[in-house]
Design a protein with these regions (language model features):
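Extracellular structured ligand-interaction cores
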Residues: 129-131, 189-193, 205, 287-289, ...
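Active-site nucleotide/adenylate-binding loops and adjacent lid/helix of ATP-dependent enzymes
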Residues: 79-192, 200-201
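ATP-dependent carboxylate/phosphate-activation module, predominantly the ATP-grasp catalytic core
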Residues: 185, 189-273
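C-terminal active-site "lid" helix and adjoining low-complexity regulatory extension at the edge
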Residues: 17, 249-276, 280-287, 294-337
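Short, flexible loop/turn elements at secondary-structure junctions
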Residues: 138, 152, 173-175, 196-198, ...
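Acidic carboxylate-rich catalytic motifs and surrounding loops in phosphoryl-/glycosyl-chemistry enzymes
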Residues: 113-117, 210, 288-291
């Protein structure tokens, strides 16, 4: 059923309360009649594969049809995933244990398969560390990730039991990020999301953005309260002030005061090369979003995604002042989208 089937699934599972809330927001922003806005959102869903979140975040209400056709929407991103990625290989990235095993040379930190280890193995592992990061296996967007301190438990037996209750699969050494990355926001490991596309046997780094935490949680994901900003692919400098999912703009990080635009990401060339090299190890997935941390001695992988989100592309008004979306860039590497 292709595109029609996708639209039918979206209609069946849509959050209609959020849809009508979006209509209200756009009405306040644009002054346009609510009925006209709702009709336009529905039309954009059929014509461009745009969801109501796309409509609001990218301000489709201020774009003409030619401009709208240049944006990577939810539907187009899903089509790109379907075109380039073999779903029978998704488990390699979805399952953190499999990912850590296959891409172990790029992790640069100690970790333990907690789901299969014994209590004594866990206790031995913890002799080296005062705190750890713990992760469930198949969740995304930073869900279930936590930092635990050994001192917060009476015994390591108690700590082990608590991790079992949480159904944790991976425990790992805490990444000590590069001082330049820590300066942006010391409360989280601030990662670089790098998008790779395989084309004619070559791995291309097509886009990258920095994701910064903005809460007490040790995660930076924009779906968990974080913010992001595109990075200049040539220089490795942050290209714009940061934005979050509520469309707030940050010239400086609210927790550190660090000026965001123009900030240089360390080890930029090494980071790009690592992602291209890793992409070639898994040619069955031609479109991957890699989450990379920068440690004092270089880049390392946190995780990777076989359905990388399109909401981090440089398509919000601040990032696309010419009102041209990211689709023309992707079409340089992919035919048929």
């Amino acid at each position: 059923m292709g595109k029609l089937g996708y639209i039918i699934r979206c209609i069946a599972h849509m959050d209609y309360s959020a849809l009508f809330d979006t209509v209200k927001q756009v009405h306040k922003l644009s002054g346009k009649p609510r009925a006209a806005i709702l009709a336009d959102i529905v039309s954009c869903g059929f014509k461009y594969g745009a969801g109501y979140k796309d409509y609001l975040l990218c301000e489709f209400y201020n774009l003409n049809s030619e401009q709208r056709a240049t944006f990577v929407t939810r539907g187009i991103n899903n089509s790109l995933v379907k075109l380039l990625n073999d779903s029978s290989y998704y488990h390699i990235l979805d399952n953190k244990t499999e990912f850590y095993t296959m891409f172990g040379e790029y992790l640069h930190r100690k970790w333990l398969n907690f789901a299969k280890c014994s209590k004594s193995e866990f206790i031995d592992f913890m002799q080296e560390f005062d705190e750890i990061i713990c992760k469930p296996d198949d969740l995304c967007c930073g869900e279930g990730v936590d930092k635990l301190k050994k001192a917060d438990f009476n015994t390591l037996d108690d700590m082990y039991d608590e991790l079992k209750k949480r159904q944790i699969s991976i425990v790992e050494e805490v990444v000590k990020q590069h001082p330049d990355m820590n300066r942006i926001n010391p409360e989280s490991v601030n990662t670089i999301r790098v998008y790779t596309i395989l084309s004619e046997g070559r791995a291309n780094t097509v886009y990258a953005c920095i994701r910064m935490g903005n809460s007490d949680r040790p995660v930076d994901n924009i779906n968990a309260g974080g913010m992001y900003s595109p990075i200049d692919m040539e220089t490795g400098r942050i290209a714009f002030p940061a934005c979050d999912k509520q469309r707030n703009v940050y010239e400086k990080h609210p927790r550190s005061g660090c000026v965001i635009k123009g900030y240089q990401i360390p080890y930029w060339e090494e980071l790009m090369q690592m992602c291209r090299e890793a992409a070639l190890k898994l040619p069955q997935l031609g479109y991957i979003g890699w989450d990379v941390a920068i440690a004092e001695d270089g880049p390392l992988f946190i995780e990777a995604n076989n359905m990388p989100g399109h909401d981090a592309f440089p398509q919000m008004p601040l990032q696309a002042p010419d009102k041209i979306g990211f689709l023309p860039t992707l079409r340089q590497y992919v035919k048929g989208i």
